[in-house]
Amino acid sequence: MAVQQKIRIKLKSYDHSLVDKWALKIIDVVKQTDAIIFGPIPLPTKTHVYTVNRSPHVDKKSREQFAFSSHKRLIEIINPTARTIDMLMKLELPSGVDVEIKS
């Protein structure tokens, strides 16, 4: 039984539509190379809440909260070819999307 190679691509962004759009573009590129693909798998959204004082030095009771949601998608590619990797390397992702690739 041969060992299957796989690549995991994790996309992160504060904008969910940007993550979904680029996940679909990556899937379209990989489908052209006849590799098996799973995804995009939505991972849990993390919300980061930051609390700051409204006043510079007094009124501790007066605060303001800011929240940022971090959206993630996971794409798995099974048995990638050299052509698959070349096409993935040629993709130019926008600055708002963070990409993490593991093999």
From Swiss-Prot:
Family classification: Belongs to the universal ribosomal protein uS10 family.
One GO CC annotation: ribonucleoprotein complex
Keywords: Ribonucleoprotein, Ribosomal protein
Name of the featured protein: Small ribosomal subunit protein uS10
Presence of keyword NAD: no
Residues passing through the membrane, by range: none
Entries under PROSITE patterns matching the protein: RIBOSOMAL_S10
Biological processes per GO annotation: translation
Listed PANTHER family: 30S RIBOSOMAL PROTEIN S10 FAMILY MEMBER
Top-rank taxon, per record: Bacteria
Entry-linked NCBIfam families: PRK00596.1, rpsJ_bact
Function in brief: Involved in the binding of tRNA to the ribosomes.
Keyword Chaperone: no
Recorded coiled-coil stretches: none
Self-association and partners: Part of the 30S ribosomal subunit.
GO MF term list: structural constituent of ribosome; tRNA binding
